[in-house]
Amino acid sequence: MKSLQKGFTLIELMIVVAIIGILAAIAIPQYQNYIARSQVSRVMSETGQMRTAIETCVLDGKEAGECFIGWTGSNLLDGDFTAGTESTAAATGQAGITIKYPVAADDEGNIVATFGRNAAAAIKPQTLTWSRSKEGTWTCATTVEAKFQPTGCKDK
């Protein structure tokens, strides 16, 4: 009488475990890169929304203290709130955000976001900066590695 094999042998199970290990070794770093890229894109979008409020305030002739930015805090930013260095800062109440408020329509300004402890390890403590030219155009620049930079945000 022949006995029928039921189940898997130890060798077959070890091969499956090895294959899963190889796939995990490839997938986990790629997933971490994806997370870092998505976090940079998220902060770019969140801080980019402040441009409209700042531009509206500047064109309406409001000072930084009179202007409500309407910022929703981000858990990806960290650090102490720092006032802008060359002109009055618009208070966002968010640590990790620095705003150099343009005092006139033909003045320069910027929004600087510093990635904090909740951000992916590959992007902290890097920065993302929106800069306003004297002509009123905004450009994005960042200090994160090129592989994490979203479209429209170049090296700083």
Curated annotation (Swiss-Prot):
Q: List the disulfide bonds.
A: C57-C67, C140-C153
The record's annotation in Pfam families points to: N_methyl, Pilin
**Predominant location category:** other
Keywords recorded for this protein, A-Z = Disulfide bond, Fimbrium, Membrane, Methylation, Transmembrane, Transmembrane helix
Q: Which SUPFAM superfamilies match?
A: Pili subunits
| Propeptide stretch(es), residue numbers | 1-7
What is the membrane topology listed in the Swiss-Prot or TrEMBL record?
Single-pass membrane protein
Where does it localize?
Fimbrium; Membrane
Q: Which NCBIfam families match?
A: IV_pilin_GFxxxE
Family the UniProt entry places it in: Belongs to the N-Me-Phe pilin family.
Subunit (UniProt): The pili are polar flexible filaments of about 5.4 nanometers diameter and 2.5 micrometers average length; they consist of only a single polypeptide chain arranged in a helical configuration of five subunits per turn in the assembled pilus.
This protein is called Type IV major fimbrial protein FimA
Q: Which gene encodes it?
A: fimA
